[in-house]
Regions:
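Acidic (Asp/Glu)-rich catalytic clusters
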Residues: 1, 24-29, 51-59, 82-90
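Short acidic/histidine-rich active-site segments
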Residues: 90-107
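Charged helix-capping and loop-helix junction motifs
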Residues: 48-53, 74-82, 109-113
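Mid-to-C-terminal alpha-helical segments outside catalytic/metal-binding sites
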Residues: 110-143
Length: 143
């Protein structure tokens, strides 16, 4: 397919968890080398850890988005994200802010708070560097 031939990134977008896995499976069959499960634990996707582990085994990066960690679900969401990253392995994960909307923190501030929240929940500096810098660079084909 076009994605494999042009070495593009296959992102699952806002597909359901089942559809996202289907895309990753088929992407692998088609020879796609760069894949990401977008917003894996957020609505409407809400993948289970076992689904994320399967996608990671198939070669996809699993994306966790911080959003506004100060909202009513922020602390519990950070707990879930940190736990999932530990179970899946930081080598298979990426993080992003998903910010920039009016009324939310600025992306740089929100992203810093997201990384601090993950560190407070036991992710090492090495893991944070991997999920925030090294893995995204790999996904994009950067050195």
């Amino acid at each position: 397919g076009v994605i494999a031939r042009r070495n593009l990134v296959l992102a699952t977008g806002h597909s359901s968890s089942e559809e996202g896995l289907m895309l990753v499976r088929e992407g692998g069959r088609q020879g796609v080398r760069r894949m990401v499960v977008t917003h894996a634990m957020n609505e409407p996707i809400v993948m289970s850890v076992s689904q994320m582990q399967e996608a990671a085994t198939l070669g996809a990066f699993i994306e966790f988005v911080g959003g506004n960690i100060g909202d009513k679900d922020g602390s519990a969401r950070m707990d879930r994200f940190a736990d999932a990253i530990k179970k899946i392995g930081a080598e298979h994960c990426i993080v992003s802010s998903d910010l920039g909307q009016k009324g939310n923190p600025l992306p740089a501030e929100g992203f810093g708070a997201f990384l601090a929240a993950l560190k407070a929940r036991g992710l090492s500096d090495q893991d944070l560097d991997r999920v925030s810098r090294r893995n995204p660079a790999t996904l994009l084909g950067l050195p």
